[in-house]
């Protein structure tokens, strides 16, 4: 397995902690977020990880040089310019093997996902006649922004249910209004489509990386890339119905995150 950890973010929602350190080194249960994600990936079988850096990049580099994980870890340096999630993958693409998917994991996400199984599905799907160009881990979590999938779980678009905005290359989705899925039946179809929340964990195949390299532009979100190309490339969603996920993006979520890891580690 090869993987990438998004650790370049500014961590503005974790201020004042991130006034003096990168979000990746904020501790949950006495361990930095970066350490937790690296160990999760290593335990899942990752032998090579790329970590992108920007905010207080030297602290992350020093941390990785000081702590040995027994696997190959490379740095993708965005110190001069933050490239956003899609641009970050594009910059780091040359550091990966070109014949297998890359598992992407946000540094501030804690979950109960079986990463080895998820990566296996991405790899297996990539070898079929209907190859999957990216596999996105999604769930029925309540939010305001959802990815829109066909009944067969192919990515079709994105919507903000608060504003009614829809982004999609498919004309059939234009003008449709979606609602927050029902708590009692969150997997029900709306206008023939599923709505699921993105988890910040996904696997991108070499075919999609090649398309990304052919595009102009260096700074762009990965979701925008997926939406631009979901008509010609096969981006699939994988639903984990019992997903337990913590987005450790706000000061107020740290105590909840500590309880989350204590429960998982008990």
Question: Could you tell me what each predicted segment is?
Answer:
Residues 10, 21, 56, 79, ...:
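A generic "binding-loop/recognition-motif" signal
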Residues 100-103, 110, 116-127, 142, ...:
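Catalytic-core segments of class I nucleotidyltransferases/pyrophosphorylases
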Residues 10, 107-109:
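Active-site metal-binding loops of divalent metal-dependent hydrolases
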Residues 127-140:
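A short, conserved acidic/glycine-rich loop-to-beta-strand motif
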Residues 1-16, 25:
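N-proximal low-complexity "stem/linker" segments adjacent to membrane-targeting elements
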Residues 1-5, 27, 31-106, 115-117, ...:
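Conserved N-terminal catalytic core of the sugar/cofactor nucleotidyltransferase
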């Amino acid at each position: 397995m090869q993987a990438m950890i998004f650790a370049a973010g500014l961590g503005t929602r974790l201020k004042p902690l991130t006034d003096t350190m990168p979000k990746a080194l904020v501790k949950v249960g006495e361990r930095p977020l970066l350490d937790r994600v690296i160990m999760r990936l290593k335990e899942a079988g990752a032998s090579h990880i790329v970590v992108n850096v920007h905010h207080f990049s030297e602290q992350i580099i020093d941390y990785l040089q000081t702590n040995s994980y027994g696997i190959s870890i490379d740095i993708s340096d965005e110190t001069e310019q933050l490239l956003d999630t899609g641009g970050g993958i594009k910059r780091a693409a040359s550091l990966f093997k070109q014949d297998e998917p890359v598992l992407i994991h946000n540094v501030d996400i804690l979950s109960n996902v079986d990463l080895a199984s998820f990566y296996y599905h991405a790899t297996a799907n990539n070898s079929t006649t209907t190859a999957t160009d990216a596999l996105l881990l999604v769930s029925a979590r309540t939010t305001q922004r959802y990815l829109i999938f066909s009944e067969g779980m192919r990515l079709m678009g994105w919507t903000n249910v608060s504003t009614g905005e829809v982004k999609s290359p498919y004309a059939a989705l234009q003008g449709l209004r979606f609602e927050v899925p029902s708590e009692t039946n969150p997997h029900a179809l709306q206008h023939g489509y599923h709505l699921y929340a993105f988890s910040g964990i996904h696997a991108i195949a070499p075919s999609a990386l090649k398309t990304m390299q052919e595009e102009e532009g260096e700074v762009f979100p990965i979701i925008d890339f997926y939406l631009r190309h979901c008509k010609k490339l096969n981006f699939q969603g994988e639903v984990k119905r019992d997903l337990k996920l913590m987005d450790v993006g706000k000061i107020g979520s740290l105590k909840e995150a500590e309880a989350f890891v204590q429960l998982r580690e008990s």
